[in-house]
Amino acid sequence: ISFMLLMIFVLGIASVLTYYRMSALLQTNAEKHISQTAMQANGRLDALIAQINTLTTQVATDAYVQRLLLAEVQGKETPFSSRQSLLPLFSDYQAYVTGIKSLELYTNDYRRLFPLNETQLIDTIDSEWINAANWGKGSLVWIGIDPRDPSTVLALRRVSLLDRWFSSGGYLMV
C-alpha cells in the first residue's frame, strides 16, 4: 500500500509539473502566433489604406470627373446623362480595390452627383468631417464606422480642380 501511495504521489507531482510547463509553453507559442498575426494584419491594412488613397487620388484627378466638377463650379448643372456616365468609370476604378463598397461624388454645395439619388453629403456625415476634408486640401480624411452600415468605414477627400488653381470642386466619399 505504501508503494502505491508513493507512486500516486510521484505521478501527481509529475503531472502538475508537466501541466505547468506545457501551459507556459503553449502560452508563449500563442503569444508569438498572435503577435505574428497582428503584424500581418497590420501590413495588409496599411496596404489597403495605401490602395484606397491611390485610387481616390486617381478618381479625383480623372479628366471626366474634373470636367464635371469644373462645370458645376461655373454654375452649369450636370445633366442626368453625364451623371450616368460616371457608373462605368467608377466601376472600373472600384474593380482595382476589393475593400471599396462604393464611391460617391458630391458637388461643393453637397449635392450628390453619383450614385444617382438626391442624398446630400451633409445628410450622410457631420459637417466637421467636411471641414476636415477642406483643411486637408485633397488629403484623404478617415471618418470612421459608417452609421448606416457598421461593417464599413468611411473616408472623404476634397476634389481639387486642377484647372482652377486647385480650388475645391467637390467631394469624393469612399
Tell where the protein language model's regions lie, with residue ranges.
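Juxtamembrane extracytoplasmic/periplasmic/luminal helical "stalk" adjacent to the first N-terminal
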Residues: 1-73
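Short amphipathic alpha-helical segments
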Residues: 35, 39, 83-91
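Short regulatory alpha-helical segment in sensory/regulatory domains of signaling proteins that mediates
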Residues: 46, 60, 90-98
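Extracytoplasmic/periplasmic ligand-binding sensor regions of membrane-associated signaling proteins
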Residues: 94-174
